[in-house]
Swiss-Prot record:
Name of the gene: ndk
Needed cofactors: Mg(2+)
Binding site for ATP: K11, F59, R87, T93, R104, N114
Catalysis performed (reactions): a 2'-deoxyribonucleoside 5'-diphosphate + ATP = a 2'-deoxyribonucleoside 5'-triphosphate + ADP; a ribonucleoside 5'-diphosphate + ATP = a ribonucleoside 5'-triphosphate + ADP
EC number(s) from the headed UniProt entry: 2.7.4.6
Organism: Bartonella quintana (strain Toulouse) (Rochalimaea quintana)
Tree of life domain: Bacteria
Official protein name in the record: Nucleoside diphosphate kinase
């Protein structure tokens, strides 16, 4: 098994409800280690750039509006198979479909306000990490 890094974001719906500590604890309890973390409030342009892959999707405008509506906590996580492990701990995008005990089952309000975002591949992780962090900010 390989130690790898992935990107994680705690979204505005969760930061508004002061859940950053509880969510980070769930990630750490799963064996993931936070090697970089900062609180950011993205503007519309940053949200549009970060979620550019969804630009043609019908929910894009709503997503950009939501993601720029409040602070987020962006993190780099490290661990054995970190990408898959993070996705497992997050749970299904739709909290109604998420397994018991996952972040989205426990904390999400809806499919759009689903508390967290995580990279879905090594390539995406690299892109998302470098969007928010310089190498000097990642301390393993």
């Amino acid at each position: 098994m390989a130690v790898e890094r992935t990107f994680s974001m705690i979204k505005p719906d969760a930061t508004r409800r002061n859940l950053t500590g509880a969510i980070t604890k769930m990630l750490e309890d799963a064996g993931l280690r936070v090697v970089a973390s900062k609180r950011v409030w993205m503007n519309r342009r940053e949200a549009e750039r970060f979620y550019a892959v969804h630009r043609e999707r019908p929910f894009f405008s709503e997503l950009v509006e939501f993601m720029s509506s409040g602070p987020t906590l962006v993190q780099v996580l490290e661990g054995e198979n970190a990408i898959a492990k993070n996705r497992e701990v997050m749970g299904a995008t739709n909290p109604a479909d998420a397994q018991e005990g996952t972040i989205r089952k426990v904390h999400a309000l809806s499919i759009s306000e689903n508390s967290v975002h995580g990279s879905d591949s090594a390539e995406t992780a690299k892109t998302e990490i470098t969007f928010w962090f310089s190498e000097m900010e990642i301390v393993g």
